[in-house]
Amino acid sequence: MSWSYLNDSFVKKEDVKISPFDRGFLFGDGVYELIPVYRGKLFLYDEHIARLVNSLESTKINPPKKWKEFRTVVEELIQKNGYENQAIYIQITRGMEEVRNHAPNHQTVPTLFINSTELTLDIENKKNAKQEFSVKVQEDMRWSRCDIKAITLLGNVMSLNDTRIDEVIYHKEGLVTEGAKSNIFCVLDGIITTPAISNDILGGITRQYFIDLFLKLN
């Protein structure tokens, strides 16, 4: 049996129900975060939550009611599902409004949805995995607030709607920005480089983790 969390309750996955009048469904009006769990431990939880808070503040979406107990809820969900390695998906939309209107009601109660799926870390298979990847390079024609981890990912979906490619690398004004589902690192003349943080890229948590690691190793 697999469990999710919706608003104030743990719910069996097959029983999760969200209104079609939710602004996340109608407008893609929401933000999300994905936190990996390795051997039962949350990876860089505080950093992920800080980015989630930034997304909420940038979009002026109200935080969920149980914000102070949020980590407790997440850890209980991890225990209930029992996978050693998991991917915790957190989505917060602006909430449900009966009248469809582009302009939001700032008193609307947000919808909180948390889901857990098993994360497969098959090291032996990865050692034998393909070493070459098919990548497409294209101009970034998505919106200009990629620093917000928004659920509106249609641009990314359209870019990746091709079974022949593994990833898309975006560029804007001649400069590489990010991948459709990744941050970019490159070794140039023996120096590791990555695009600087701006509104054109999402500040990856793992990206920053490796930057800090590289600086320590010098």
What is each residue range found by the language model?
Residues 79-92, 99:
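Ordered, amphipathic secondary-structure segments that act as subunit-interaction surfaces
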Residues 1-76, 98-218:
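Helix-start/capping segments and mature chain N-termini
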